[in-house]
């Protein structure tokens, strides 16, 4: 296979100083026989459980502190800023802790985006999503068990479309919010960037967590911020409210579209995967330097 080249404006093209990892096999049954897969699945389950436990407790605590009927005040509690920090901060911590074991997905949309980019296999994708959803259900279940008097009264942290917004607006918010998150994941874990700066792999959880924080600031007033189907599904299962289930499709369809769009944009536009494939025919070889 020909060696890819980078642009060198002052002379001939220079040899690429990094190497892309080979694409993951689409379907690999051999993977099911290996312990590292199950270790990664367990890590995804536990990480998603902890993520939902801390973040949903934060949401319910904020609502309890600002409930005027219970003596709360409007300016009490952590506010939307604090809720956003809880979600973003937990993602930062958990991605940092699990990146070396499972990749630190903690989100079916991230897993699907990486699958579409051939970063993970179908087997791993399915097992991760199941583990993430089960972890989310257990995390919300613990919240209800420990805060039963507040859980149902304050909505169980379930994602619902806010009054005054139509479903199209909610869907758009979820698509764009998830695009921001998954695009950040691709950028933070880009092998080209990792090869050229040894600090990037260590710092990758920071921009990912910060992306979650920023998206929450923007979309909490609209949908309560999903951008993670497992988070929305787990809360809906434990809260079991009709409106939460009626709006549930928004928190699956939106994030999956956003993840697919981010995967396409990063792989085929920024990394020019399509041009590199066509370059093997010769006529497009000059475009390889832009990858």
From Swiss-Prot:
Modification sites for N6,N6-dimethyllysine: 3
Motif annotated as NPA 1, chain positions: 107-109
A Gene Ontology BP annotation from the UniProt entry: root hair elongation
Gene Ontology molecular function: water channel activity
Annotated compartments: Cell membrane
Topological type in the membrane: Multi-pass membrane protein
Stated name of the protein: Probable aquaporin PIP2-4
Functional summary from the UniProt entry: Aquaporins facilitate the transport of water and small neutral solutes across cell membranes.
Record key words, sorted: Acetylation, Cell membrane, Membrane, Methylation, Phosphoprotein, Repeat, Transmembrane, Transmembrane helix, Transport
Residues found modified as N-acetylmethionine: 1
Pfam families the UniProt entry points to: MIP (PF00230)
KW Transit peptide (keyword) present: no
Listed InterPro entries: Aquaporin-like, Aquaporin_transptr, MIP, MIP_CS
Modified residues (N-acetylalanine): 2
Domain notes: The Asn-Pro-Ala (NPA) motifs may contribute to the formation of two hemipores that could generate a narrow channel.
GO cellular component: plasma membrane; plasmodesma
Modification sites for Phosphoserine: 283, 286, 289
Keyword Ubl conjugation belongs to the record: no
